[in-house]
Amino acid sequence: MTTTDFGSATDMEGTEVTGTEAAGTDAAGTEVENMATGELGPWRAWASATGPADRAAAEAGVRRAYRLAGLPEPERVVWVGSPRAAVTLLREDLADRGASVRDAVRSAPWARQRRSLYTELGAAGWSAHWAATGGRLWESTQALVDRIRTGVIEDLAGRDTGKEAAEIRLLLLDAVLGQHDAPWLAAFPADDGPLDALTAVCRHAGWWWPYARVAVLSERPVALHRDEAGRLDHGDGPALAYPDAFALHAWRGMPVPAEFLAGLATLTPERIRAEENAELRRVMLEYYGYDRYLTDSGARPLHQDETGTLWRIDLVDDEPVVMVEVLNSTPEPDGTRRTYWLRVPPSTRTARAGVAWTFGLAAEAYAPAAET
Protein backbone atom coordinates (compact mmCIF):
# COMPACT_ATOMS: atom_id res chain seq x y z
CA MET A 1 0.00 0.00 0.00
CA THR A 2 1.27 3.47 -0.83
CA THR A 3 1.61 5.78 2.15
CA THR A 4 1.02 9.48 1.98
CA ASP A 5 3.24 11.99 3.78
CA PHE A 6 1.11 14.30 5.89
CA GLY A 7 3.95 15.25 8.26
CA SER A 8 4.35 14.30 11.90
CA ALA A 9 1.43 13.88 14.27
CA THR A 10 2.20 17.25 15.81
CA ASP A 11 2.09 18.90 12.39
CA MET A 12 -1.21 17.25 11.60
CA GLU A 13 -2.87 18.45 14.77
CA GLY A 14 -1.84 22.08 14.24
CA THR A 15 -1.53 24.92 16.70
CA GLU A 16 -3.77 27.71 17.93
CA VAL A 17 -4.04 30.72 15.64
CA THR A 18 -5.42 33.74 17.45
CA GLY A 19 -4.67 36.73 15.28
CA THR A 20 -3.31 38.08 12.05
CA GLU A 21 0.28 38.68 11.10
CA ALA A 22 1.43 42.16 10.28
CA ALA A 23 1.48 43.07 6.63
CA GLY A 24 4.67 44.52 5.25
CA THR A 25 8.20 44.62 6.63
CA ASP A 26 8.80 48.32 7.24
CA ALA A 27 11.41 49.16 9.85
CA ALA A 28 8.98 50.69 12.33
CA GLY A 29 6.65 47.71 12.19
CA THR A 30 9.51 45.22 12.54
CA GLU A 31 10.92 47.06 15.54
CA VAL A 32 7.55 47.21 17.26
CA GLU A 33 6.86 43.53 16.60
CA ASN A 34 10.26 42.48 17.94
CA MET A 35 9.64 44.48 21.11
CA ALA A 36 6.19 42.98 21.65
CA THR A 37 6.57 39.34 20.65
CA GLY A 38 8.03 38.12 23.94
CA GLU A 39 5.58 39.98 26.17
CA LEU A 40 2.30 38.23 25.43
CA GLY A 41 2.70 35.31 27.83
CA PRO A 42 1.23 37.04 30.89
CA TRP A 43 -1.64 38.53 28.89
CA ARG A 44 -2.51 35.13 27.43
CA ALA A 45 -2.44 33.64 30.93
CA TRP A 46 -4.68 36.37 32.38
CA ALA A 47 -7.19 36.04 29.53
CA SER A 48 -7.60 32.32 30.23
CA ALA A 49 -7.08 32.36 34.01
CA THR A 50 -9.35 30.26 36.21
CA GLY A 51 -9.76 30.18 39.96
CA PRO A 52 -10.76 32.67 42.65
CA ALA A 53 -10.32 36.37 41.99
CA ASP A 54 -7.91 38.41 44.07
CA ARG A 55 -10.70 40.55 45.42
CA ALA A 56 -8.58 43.11 47.24
CA ALA A 57 -6.37 43.76 44.20
CA ALA A 58 -9.34 43.87 41.84
CA GLU A 59 -11.28 46.30 44.04
CA ALA A 60 -8.23 48.55 44.32
CA GLY A 61 -8.03 48.59 40.51
CA VAL A 62 -11.71 49.46 40.21
CA ARG A 63 -11.46 52.35 42.67
CA ARG A 64 -8.36 53.67 40.90
CA ALA A 65 -10.16 53.47 37.53
CA TYR A 66 -12.91 55.69 38.93
CA ARG A 67 -10.39 58.20 40.29
CA LEU A 68 -8.44 58.33 37.02
CA ALA A 69 -11.72 59.08 35.24
CA GLY A 70 -12.33 62.00 37.61
CA LEU A 71 -15.20 60.21 39.35
CA PRO A 72 -15.90 59.54 43.02
CA GLU A 73 -15.13 55.98 44.03
CA PRO A 74 -18.15 53.66 44.10
CA GLU A 75 -19.97 53.59 47.41
CA ARG A 76 -20.20 49.81 47.25
CA VAL A 77 -18.47 46.94 45.49
CA VAL A 78 -20.63 43.83 45.09
CA TRP A 79 -19.21 40.43 44.12
CA VAL A 80 -21.12 37.76 42.19
CA GLY A 81 -20.26 34.29 40.93
CA SER A 82 -20.58 34.83 37.18
CA PRO A 83 -21.69 37.23 34.43
CA ARG A 84 -25.11 35.56 34.56
CA ALA A 85 -25.40 36.33 38.27
CA ALA A 86 -24.36 39.94 37.62
CA VAL A 87 -27.10 40.44 35.03
CA THR A 88 -29.65 38.79 37.32
CA LEU A 89 -28.66 41.08 40.19
CA LEU A 90 -28.84 44.18 38.01
CA ARG A 91 -32.31 43.24 36.75
CA GLU A 92 -33.76 42.42 40.17
CA ASP A 93 -31.90 44.69 42.57
CA LEU A 94 -29.50 47.64 42.82
CA ALA A 95 -32.03 50.17 41.57
CA ASP A 96 -29.91 52.83 43.30
CA ARG A 97 -26.76 51.97 41.36
CA GLY A 98 -26.83 55.13 39.25
CA ALA A 99 -25.92 55.53 35.61
CA SER A 100 -23.32 53.40 33.86
CA VAL A 101 -19.85 55.00 33.86
CA ARG A 102 -18.29 52.45 31.52
CA ASP A 103 -17.45 55.04 28.89
CA ALA A 104 -15.61 57.19 31.43
CA VAL A 105 -13.60 54.45 33.14
CA ARG A 106 -12.90 52.21 30.15
CA SER A 107 -13.74 53.56 26.69
CA ALA A 108 -12.39 57.11 27.04
CA PRO A 109 -8.91 56.21 28.40
CA TRP A 110 -8.58 53.46 25.81
CA ALA A 111 -9.47 55.86 22.99
CA ARG A 112 -6.91 58.41 24.22
CA GLN A 113 -4.14 55.81 24.44
CA ARG A 114 -4.93 54.38 21.04
CA ARG A 115 -4.97 57.84 19.47
CA SER A 116 -1.63 58.71 21.07
CA LEU A 117 0.07 55.49 19.98
CA TYR A 118 -1.42 55.69 16.49
CA THR A 119 -0.04 59.22 16.13
CA GLU A 120 3.38 58.05 17.29
CA LEU A 121 3.58 54.94 15.09
CA GLY A 122 1.58 55.94 12.03
CA ALA A 123 -0.91 53.72 10.23
CA ALA A 124 1.56 51.01 9.19
CA GLY A 125 3.33 51.01 12.54
CA TRP A 126 0.07 50.75 14.47
CA SER A 127 -1.12 47.88 12.26
CA ALA A 128 2.13 45.99 12.84
CA HIS A 129 2.05 46.68 16.56
CA TRP A 130 -1.54 45.46 16.95
CA ALA A 131 -0.81 42.32 14.91
CA ALA A 132 2.18 41.55 17.16
CA THR A 133 0.31 42.16 20.42
CA GLY A 134 -3.44 42.20 20.92
CA GLY A 135 -4.19 40.81 17.48
CA ARG A 136 -2.62 37.51 18.48
CA LEU A 137 -5.07 37.10 21.34
CA TRP A 138 -8.14 38.75 19.90
CA GLU A 139 -9.84 36.01 17.90
CA SER A 140 -9.96 33.26 20.53
CA THR A 141 -10.76 35.66 23.37
CA GLN A 142 -13.55 37.42 21.49
CA ALA A 143 -15.07 34.07 20.52
CA LEU A 144 -15.17 33.18 24.22
CA VAL A 145 -16.76 36.53 25.10
CA ASP A 146 -19.44 36.03 22.45
CA ARG A 147 -20.23 32.55 23.78
CA ILE A 148 -20.56 33.84 27.34
CA ARG A 149 -22.93 36.58 26.24
CA THR A 150 -25.01 34.12 24.25
CA GLY A 151 -25.05 31.68 27.16
CA VAL A 152 -26.27 34.34 29.59
CA ILE A 153 -29.07 35.39 27.24
CA GLU A 154 -30.14 31.79 26.63
CA ASP A 155 -30.09 30.96 30.34
CA LEU A 156 -32.10 34.00 31.40
CA ALA A 157 -34.38 34.63 28.41
CA GLY A 158 -34.69 31.18 26.87
CA ARG A 159 -36.27 31.39 23.44
CA ASP A 160 -37.43 34.96 23.95
CA THR A 161 -36.02 37.31 21.33
CA GLY A 162 -38.01 40.38 22.28
CA LYS A 163 -37.97 42.83 25.16
CA GLU A 164 -36.47 40.51 27.78
CA ALA A 165 -33.56 39.42 25.57
CA ALA A 166 -32.94 43.04 24.56
CA GLU A 167 -32.80 44.12 28.21
CA ILE A 168 -30.25 41.42 29.02
CA ARG A 169 -28.19 42.29 25.95
CA LEU A 170 -28.00 45.95 27.01
CA LEU A 171 -26.84 45.01 30.51
CA LEU A 172 -24.13 42.81 29.01
CA LEU A 173 -22.93 45.78 26.97
CA ASP A 174 -22.50 47.74 30.22
CA ALA A 175 -19.78 45.29 31.29
CA VAL A 176 -16.06 45.93 31.29
CA LEU A 177 -14.56 42.56 30.42
CA GLY A 178 -11.83 42.29 33.05
CA GLN A 179 -9.60 39.34 32.15
CA HIS A 180 -11.10 39.24 28.66
CA ASP A 181 -9.93 42.80 27.98
CA ALA A 182 -6.40 41.34 27.86
CA PRO A 183 -6.08 41.51 24.03
CA TRP A 184 -6.47 45.27 23.70
CA LEU A 185 -4.70 46.06 26.98
CA ALA A 186 -1.71 44.06 25.73
CA ALA A 187 -1.17 46.67 23.02
CA PHE A 188 -0.43 49.48 25.49
CA PRO A 189 2.07 50.23 28.27
CA ALA A 190 0.66 48.79 31.49
CA ASP A 191 2.80 50.31 34.25
CA ASP A 192 1.89 53.62 35.89
CA GLY A 193 -0.14 54.73 32.88
CA PRO A 194 -3.75 55.72 32.34
CA LEU A 195 -4.69 52.07 31.76
CA ASP A 196 -2.92 50.56 34.78
CA ALA A 197 -6.14 50.41 36.82
CA LEU A 198 -7.92 48.46 34.07
CA THR A 199 -4.90 46.19 33.82
CA ALA A 200 -5.10 45.49 37.56
CA VAL A 201 -8.70 44.32 37.24
CA CYS A 202 -7.78 42.29 34.14
CA ARG A 203 -5.10 40.47 36.12
CA HIS A 204 -7.26 39.71 39.14
CA ALA A 205 -10.97 39.36 38.22
CA GLY A 206 -13.58 38.57 35.61
CA TRP A 207 -16.14 40.90 34.08
CA TRP A 208 -17.28 43.98 35.98
CA TRP A 209 -20.03 46.57 35.76
CA PRO A 210 -19.17 50.17 36.76
CA TYR A 211 -22.04 52.42 37.81
CA ALA A 212 -22.01 55.80 39.50
CA ARG A 213 -22.69 54.46 42.99
CA VAL A 214 -22.07 50.70 42.75
CA ALA A 215 -19.53 48.46 41.01
CA VAL A 216 -20.46 44.81 40.41
CA LEU A 217 -17.55 42.38 39.96
CA SER A 218 -17.71 38.79 38.75
CA GLU A 219 -15.51 35.91 39.75
CA ARG A 220 -13.42 34.21 37.08
CA PRO A 221 -14.31 30.74 35.77
CA VAL A 222 -13.29 27.71 37.78
CA ALA A 223 -12.76 25.63 34.63
CA LEU A 224 -11.94 26.35 30.99
CA HIS A 225 -11.32 23.67 28.36
CA ARG A 226 -10.43 24.47 24.75
CA ASP A 227 -9.10 22.52 21.80
CA GLU A 228 -5.92 23.26 19.85
CA ALA A 229 -7.82 25.83 17.77
CA GLY A 230 -8.91 27.76 20.86
CA ARG A 231 -12.54 26.63 20.69
CA LEU A 232 -14.53 25.57 23.75
CA ASP A 233 -14.27 21.79 23.87
CA HIS A 234 -14.90 19.19 26.58
CA GLY A 235 -16.53 15.81 26.34
CA ASP A 236 -16.75 15.21 30.08
CA GLY A 237 -18.60 18.10 31.69
CA PRO A 238 -18.69 21.85 31.07
CA ALA A 239 -16.16 23.44 28.75
CA LEU A 240 -16.52 26.66 30.76
CA ALA A 241 -17.78 26.74 34.35
CA TYR A 242 -18.18 29.46 36.98
CA PRO A 243 -18.33 28.92 40.75
CA ASP A 244 -22.09 29.56 40.89
CA ALA A 245 -22.83 26.71 38.42
CA PHE A 246 -23.26 28.91 35.32
CA ALA A 247 -21.66 26.77 32.62
CA LEU A 248 -21.28 26.32 28.88
CA HIS A 249 -21.02 22.91 27.26
CA ALA A 250 -19.35 22.49 23.88
CA TRP A 251 -17.68 19.98 21.62
CA ARG A 252 -15.01 21.42 19.32
CA GLY A 253 -16.64 24.82 19.49
CA MET A 254 -20.21 23.66 18.93
CA PRO A 255 -22.64 24.39 21.79
CA VAL A 256 -24.31 21.20 23.06
CA PRO A 257 -26.77 20.46 25.89
CA ALA A 258 -25.30 19.17 29.15
CA GLU A 259 -27.44 16.03 29.02
CA PHE A 260 -26.14 15.32 25.51
CA LEU A 261 -22.55 15.15 26.74
CA ALA A 262 -23.56 12.89 29.61
CA GLY A 263 -24.72 10.29 27.07
CA LEU A 264 -21.56 10.21 24.96
CA ALA A 265 -19.87 7.57 27.11
CA THR A 266 -22.60 5.02 26.29
CA LEU A 267 -22.94 5.70 22.57
CA THR A 268 -23.77 2.90 20.17
CA PRO A 269 -24.06 2.91 16.37
CA GLU A 270 -27.82 2.52 16.78
CA ARG A 271 -28.02 5.58 19.04
CA ILE A 272 -25.98 7.61 16.56
CA ARG A 273 -28.22 6.64 13.66
CA ALA A 274 -31.33 7.45 15.72
CA GLU A 275 -30.26 11.04 16.49
CA GLU A 276 -32.45 13.39 14.44
CA ASN A 277 -30.29 16.50 14.84
CA ALA A 278 -27.64 16.34 12.11
CA GLU A 279 -25.15 18.55 13.97
CA LEU A 280 -25.41 16.52 17.16
CA ARG A 281 -25.07 13.33 15.12
CA ARG A 282 -21.79 14.61 13.70
CA VAL A 283 -20.56 15.32 17.24
CA MET A 284 -21.48 11.76 18.18
CA LEU A 285 -19.51 10.39 15.26
CA GLU A 286 -16.45 12.47 16.14
CA TYR A 287 -16.60 11.37 19.76
CA TYR A 288 -17.28 7.72 18.96
CA GLY A 289 -14.65 7.65 16.23
CA TYR A 290 -15.30 7.17 12.54
CA ASP A 291 -13.08 4.10 12.37
CA ARG A 292 -14.82 2.52 15.37
CA TYR A 293 -18.22 3.34 13.92
CA LEU A 294 -17.30 1.74 10.62
CA THR A 295 -16.07 -1.39 12.38
CA ASP A 296 -19.03 -1.68 14.75
CA SER A 297 -21.50 -1.04 11.93
CA GLY A 298 -20.06 -3.74 9.71
CA ALA A 299 -19.42 -1.17 6.99
CA ARG A 300 -17.76 -2.13 3.73
CA PRO A 301 -15.28 -0.02 1.78
CA LEU A 302 -16.49 1.68 -1.39
CA HIS A 303 -13.10 1.63 -3.07
CA GLN A 304 -9.51 0.70 -2.33
CA ASP A 305 -6.28 1.46 -4.20
CA GLU A 306 -2.63 2.16 -3.47
CA THR A 307 -3.43 5.53 -1.88
CA GLY A 308 -5.91 4.28 0.72
CA THR A 309 -9.43 3.02 1.37
CA LEU A 310 -12.64 4.98 0.72
CA TRP A 311 -15.47 4.52 3.22
CA ARG A 312 -19.03 5.83 3.25
CA ILE A 313 -21.43 6.31 6.18
CA ASP A 314 -25.05 6.85 5.16
CA LEU A 315 -27.03 9.05 7.56
CA VAL A 316 -30.78 9.65 7.77
CA ASP A 317 -31.88 13.10 6.54
CA ASP A 318 -28.29 14.24 6.03
CA GLU A 319 -25.57 13.95 3.44
CA PRO A 320 -23.37 10.86 3.80
CA VAL A 321 -20.01 11.02 5.50
CA VAL A 322 -17.32 9.89 3.06
CA MET A 323 -13.77 9.38 4.31
CA VAL A 324 -10.45 8.10 3.05
CA GLU A 325 -8.37 5.91 5.34
CA VAL A 326 -4.66 6.57 4.72
CA LEU A 327 -1.41 5.52 6.35
CA ASN A 328 0.99 8.37 7.10
CA SER A 329 4.46 7.80 5.64
CA THR A 330 6.12 9.89 8.37
CA PRO A 331 6.75 7.54 11.32
CA GLU A 332 5.93 8.39 14.90
CA PRO A 333 8.79 8.61 17.43
CA ASP A 334 8.27 4.93 18.30
CA GLY A 335 8.55 3.92 14.64
CA THR A 336 4.87 3.18 14.07
CA ARG A 337 2.82 4.86 11.38
CA ARG A 338 -0.44 6.58 12.19
CA THR A 339 -3.67 5.96 10.30
CA TYR A 340 -5.64 9.08 9.37
CA TRP A 341 -9.26 9.48 8.34
CA LEU A 342 -9.71 12.32 5.85
CA ARG A 343 -13.20 13.76 5.36
CA VAL A 344 -13.86 14.24 1.63
CA PRO A 345 -16.89 15.38 -0.44
CA PRO A 346 -19.82 12.93 -0.63
CA SER A 347 -19.40 12.77 -4.41
CA THR A 348 -15.94 11.18 -4.11
CA ARG A 349 -15.79 7.82 -5.87
CA THR A 350 -12.18 6.62 -5.43
CA ALA A 351 -9.60 6.73 -2.67
CA ARG A 352 -7.11 8.46 -4.97
CA ALA A 353 -9.64 11.17 -5.82
CA GLY A 354 -10.29 11.71 -2.12
CA VAL A 355 -6.62 12.07 -1.18
CA ALA A 356 -6.02 14.29 -4.21
CA TRP A 357 -8.93 16.53 -3.15
CA THR A 358 -7.28 17.19 0.24
CA PHE A 359 -4.31 18.63 -1.67
CA GLY A 360 -6.49 20.64 -4.05
CA LEU A 361 -5.62 18.37 -6.99
CA ALA A 362 -7.49 16.28 -9.51
CA ALA A 363 -7.09 12.52 -9.15
CA GLU A 364 -4.99 12.20 -12.31
CA ALA A 365 -2.59 14.92 -11.11
CA TYR A 366 -1.92 13.37 -7.70
CA ALA A 367 1.27 11.38 -7.13
CA PRO A 368 1.89 9.84 -3.66
CA ALA A 369 4.86 11.26 -1.80
CA ALA A 370 6.38 7.95 -0.76
CA GLU A 371 5.95 4.21 -1.11
CA THR A 372 6.54 1.33 1.29
Language-model region placement:
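Short, glycine-biased loop/turn motifs at secondary-structure junctions and
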Residues: 1-372
